[in-house]
UniProtKB/Swiss-Prot annotation:
One of its GO terms (cellular component) is cytoplasm. Its main location: cytoplasm. Bidirectionally degrades single-stranded DNA into large acid-insoluble oligonucleotides, which are then degraded further into small acid-soluble oligonucleotides. Its EC number is 3.1.11.6. The gene is xseA. The keyword Translocase does not apply. GO terms for molecular function: exodeoxyribonuclease VII activity; nucleic acid binding. This is Exodeoxyribonuclease 7 large subunit.
Length: 555
């Protein structure tokens, strides 16, 4: 018995068929009727698709996360987009789906593609017409249904991530015959009144019929004409409408749209947080310096000699003021006593005596001159026989009267001068006493004011120091308390993220024996290969004896 080629193992042949199918049937579209539909708790959908003559197994992984609004059932006519593959353990080929369209939706999809091409040719989807979102929007407009989970999701995200914003909700119908007109009118009115910095056009997921209002030309043209940037958040991540292409930004979900609006705010917050970290470090440094200063001041306060220099300076100042006042008082008192002694002395008496002596001298001199004249007259009388004695006596009496008159006038002048000098001296003493009293009063007021001023300044400095000390101590306690709270929160988060807590609940991690990387899929294992398993309290080496694919088994 001869053979043209060597025999092949079943696995080798199956792998060859699998590679051939996957390379030639990487994208296929199959139309048929569903049967044996099974939606697993994991979200994967296993099904069969058939027509009158044939049957084909299929799987749609993560189906529930993409099409949770409608659950397929046996008998549904569908169009499935996917690729062919081979399940090697059973030698069966199957289709792995990535899109599922119910019968009747094909016409809408064709209309969708035709409208999309026409509007794109007219420039409604041009990238250069896209507007940038504002950095920090102060007013956010939302065009959606006022009832439902969409608006609640948006509000929850905005309240968590945005700061100081104004939200305007324009209620519209998001499904039905009038939905397109209401939505386009809402966009036009928001632009006309310039009510918002950015608009979010939002709706939850649904079938292509439910979302068809957002494929109408009237909405696309309203979005293109809007001067306010618009974020389209219609349906789920796998749902696309013409509004998504016309809008300035497309968000996979309404919650993601709210996050996009707040993204720039988050960046600003990160910048502010970096500034806050710098301020905290600077405050810590400043607080450390102030704490040392407070401790030093506290040591001073605890010591008796802290206020001694201030008290000593104040005492020296008071003594200086008192000494100056005493010196001034002593000077004025000496001057006053000097004038008083001068007034109380026998100066006036001596001046009177001197005037009296002067008068006596004048009288005596006049008397002497009279005697001399008398003797001269007698002598002349004897010598001159023809002298008229009576005439001479008259002349003598006249001269005597003139002399007395001149002497009396001279004495009057001296008396008036003495009286004037006495009056001037009394006036000067009175003025001196008034000035002394005034200066004494001013010095007394100055002493009181200086004493009161220095006492007030000492009290003010003491109160200012106590207030500064209390403020610093309060700030220190507040900062320590806040840092303790932050430390407690971070410690709790680290405890929750600790992988050892996962091990305590009975879980383990597999690592490749040689390469030391984590094993997350059964496809990377081989029979009789060794792996390391990490548990809570140690590690162990295991040998792979059997490999099973849970997803393929369920199909």
């Amino acid at each position: 018995m001869t053979t043209s080629s060597p025999p092949q193992a079943v696995t080798t042949l199956t792998e060859s068929i699998k590679n051939l199918l996957e390379s030639n049937f990487c994208h296929i579209v199959v139309k048929g009727e569903l049967s044996n539909v099974s939606l697993q708790p994991s979200g994967h959908l296993y099904f069969g698709i058939k027509d009158n003559r044939s049957f084909l197994n299929g799987a749609f992984f993560h189906f529930k996360s993409k099409y949770f609004d409608r659950r397929p059932k046996d008998g549904d006519s569908v169009v499935i987009h996917g690729k062919l593959t081979v399940y090697a353990p059973r030698g069966q080929y199957q289709i792995i789906a990535h899109a599922l369209v119910y019968a009747g939706e094909g016409d809408l999809l064709q209309k969708f593609e035709e409208t999309k091409k026409r509007l794109a040719a007219e420039g409604y989807f041009a990238i250069e017409k896209k507007q940038a979102l504002p950095t920090i929007p102060k007013s956010i407009g939302v065009i959606t249904s006022p009832t439902g989970a969409v608006i609640q999701d948006i509000l929850r995200v905005l309240s968590r991530r945005c700061y100081q914003y104004k939200l305007l909700i324009y209620p519209v119908t998001v499904q039905g015959a009038t939905a397109a007109k209401e939505i386009s009118r809402a966009i036009e009115e928001m632009n006309k009144e310039n009510l918002a910095d950015v608009l979010i056009l939002a709706r939850g997921g649904g079938s292509i019929e439910d979302l068809w209002a957002f494929n109408e030309e009237i909405i696309v043209k309203a979005i293109a004409a809007s001067s306010i940037p618009i974020i389209s958040a219609v349906g789920h991540e796998t749902d696309y409408t013409l509004c998504d292409f016309a809008a300035d930004v497309r968000a996979p979900t309404p919650s993601a749209a709210a996050e996009i609006v707040c993204q720039s705010s988050e960046q600003q917050i990160q910048v502010l947080k970096s500034y806050l970290r710098y301020l905290n470090a600077h405050a810590q440094q400043l607080l450390s310096g102030k704490t040392k200063q407070i401790q030093q001041w506290k040591r001073y306060l605890d010591h008796v000699d802290f206020f001694r220099p201030a008290h000593q300076s104040l005492d020296y100042l008071c003594l200086s003021i008192e000494r100056s006042i005493k010196i001034k008082l002593s000077q004025y008192k000496q001057r006053y006593m000097q004038y008083a002694r001068w007034l109380q002395s026998d100066v006036l008496q001596r001046m009177t005596y001197r005037l009296y002596d002067l008068w006596k001298m004048i009288v005596q001199a006049f008397h002497n001159r009279l005697i001399a004249a008398k003797h001269l007259c007698i002598h002349q009388k004897k010598n001159l026989t023809f002298l008229n004695t009576q005439q001479f006596i008259q002349k003598l009496d006249l001269w005597k009267q003139q002399t007395r008159r001149a002497l009396r006038q001279r004495l009057g002048y001296c008396s008036q001068s003495l009286t004037h000098q006495q009056t001037s001296l009394k006036h000067f003493i009175t003025k001196l006493n008034q000035q002394f009293t005034k200066e004494n009063h001013a010095l007394s007021l100055l002493q009181k004011r200086l004493t009161r001023t220095f006492a007030n300044r000492v009290d003010e400095h003491r109160e200012s120091y106590m207030r500064s000390r209390e403020n610093l101590i309060f700030s220190l306690h507040h900062l320590v308390k806040r840092n303790r709270e932050k430390y407690s929160q971070v410690s709790k988060q680290l405890t929750l993220l600790n992988p050892k807590n996962v091990f305590k609940r009975g879980y383990a991690m597999l690592f490749d024996f040689n390469e030391n990387f984590a094993i997350i899929s059964a496809k990377s294992l081989h029979k009789h290969s060794c792996v390391r398993v990490r548990l809570q309290d140690g590690e162990a080496t295991l040998t792979v004896t059997d490999i099973q694919n849970f997803e393929t088994q369920e199909s």
